[in-house]
Swiss-Prot record:
Designated name of the protein: Snaclec coagulation factor IX/factor X-binding protein subunit B
Keyword Manganese: no
Subcellular location: Secreted
MF GO annotations: metal ion binding; toxin activity
Native source species: Bothrops jararaca
Amino acid sequence: DCPSDWSPYEGHCYRVFTEPQNWADAEKFC
């Protein structure tokens, strides 16, 4: 199960952020 503000997709959880981020920033943010 995913947190309420995350979206399940192919067995993983994804979260949509309001501000765009590149992958490097997203990985550091996690």
